[in-house]
A protein has these predicted regions:
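Domain-level signature for proteins that mediate thiol-based redox and metal-cofactor handling
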Residues: 1-145
Length: 145
């Protein structure tokens, strides 16, 4: 099996069997809702941060397989990380999908499956929508601490 096929399988697995799907809609969760008007993707991400640690990330949305699977991968990857680590992972993900080289791709875990999105510029917004939600949520939570 080649690498592209493996990446496709990761994407489809997270699309069909999403992790951390469903919102809590209660404190201490912080919700951010963003949309991609160019394609109709609609994403909600909740984050629970306690003492600088990402305790939980929940996600729910409507969209294409790239958008929804990316949300699943992102939520699974960031749980248990410090906010600082999570913010670095988000920035590394953005860099990767834009085609920039990374020092340590392994930190992205299964998110590396979206590396090929750089070849599909119209899909970059799909892949990054949930990541933009969690980035905004972390920034808003930090502002309130």
């Amino acid at each position: 099996m080649d690498l592209k096929q493996l990446y496709r399988e990761v994407i489809m697995d997270h699309y069909k069997n999403p992790k951390n799907k469903g919102l809590k809609k209660t404190d201490p969760y912080h919700l951010v809702h963003l949309t991609n008007p160019s394609c109709g993707d609609d994403m909600r991400v909740e984050i629970y941060v306690d003492h600088g640690q990402v305790v939980d990330v929940r996600q729910d949305g409507i969209g294409c397989s790239i958008c929804l699977s990316s949300a699943s991968v992102m939520s699974d990857l960031l749980i248990g990380k410090s906010v600082e680590e999570a913010q670095k992972i988000v920035q590394d993900f953005y860099s990767m999908v834009k085609g920039e080289e990374l020092e340590d791709e392994e930190k992205l875990g299964e998110a590396i499956a979206y590396k090929g999105v750089r070849e599909l510029p119209a899909r970059i917004k799909c892949a990054t929508l949930a990541w933009k939600c969690v980035e905004k949520a972390m920034n808003e939570v930090e502002d309130h601490e």
